[in-house]
Amino acid sequence: MSNYWVPLLIVGIGIVGNVLLTTVWGEEHVQSLAVRDTLRIVTYIAAVFPTLFSYIRAEERYKKSEKERRKREALDKMRDLLRAAIVKIFEGEDPETIRANIMIEDGGELIILCSINMEFNHDYNIRLAYGHGCAGMAWKRACEAPMSERWVPVLAPKTQLSTKRLRDEWHLTDEQIGITRHVLWILSVPIFQLAGSETKFLGVLSFDGVRKPLKDVHRLKDHTLHIGCADVAEYFGSMLLENNILN
């Protein structure tokens, strides 16, 4: 209702002006020609205002709808690229046992923006604070590490650890530990934008394994794989910015 008080007020003023111009009572009480001319102008404005207001509102709704449509299309494309990235980066592995997601900051925590192979898992709605979990550590690295190291992935090659170690080393809560027990390994890559000598954090690209280990577990520490992940993360960063997804 708060969005409509201005147009309602203008329409109300127009009604009053029309009454003063067209009734005997109005002619008796408003005899000044200047005032009556002003009232005519006001009533004309009030008459066209609802149409103008409706047009503006419709234009706003259209722009909002278009923005949401472009965002949906961009997210669909990002999911397709996540699927392709799994196949390319982890060539020879079973792609159905590898998940991928992009997390962005929301209210001081990371949330999943889009993902592949994890939509029906309990950890799909997980939220991670700064420095918590593999993705939270990647967030911290993107902001605090030396510039030459900010692109380096954060790796958890074995996540089947004791509750105490997961609390102490990865700063996970008991709830987070419970919903990620099925995860076997995680690799998280910072996504950031270079701005001169500074970086702007955009999000985190993560891959993880479920159901069965990788055929080649040593590949997670391969420098070439890390570079490939960083290149993919950089591309996703450009997509986040070009499609205005973070705003």
Q: Where in this protein do the model-derived segments appear?
A:
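Intrinsically disordered, low-complexity terminal regulatory regions
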Residues: 25, 29, 35-118, 122-126, ...
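A short, aliphatic-rich beta-strand micro-motif
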Residues: 175, 184-194
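Terminal peptide-recognition signature
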Residues: 102, 138, 199
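Juxtamembrane "helix exit" motif at the C-terminal ends of alpha-helical transmembrane segments
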Residues: 16-28
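Juxtadomain coupling helices with adjacent low-complexity linkers
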Residues: 198-247
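Juxtamembrane interface helix immediately N-terminal to a transmembrane segment
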Residues: 1-12
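Regulatory sensory and allosteric helical modules in signal-transduction proteins
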Residues: 113-181
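Short hydrophobic/aromatic beta-strand element in the GNAT-like acyltransferase core
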Residues: 99, 186-188, 204
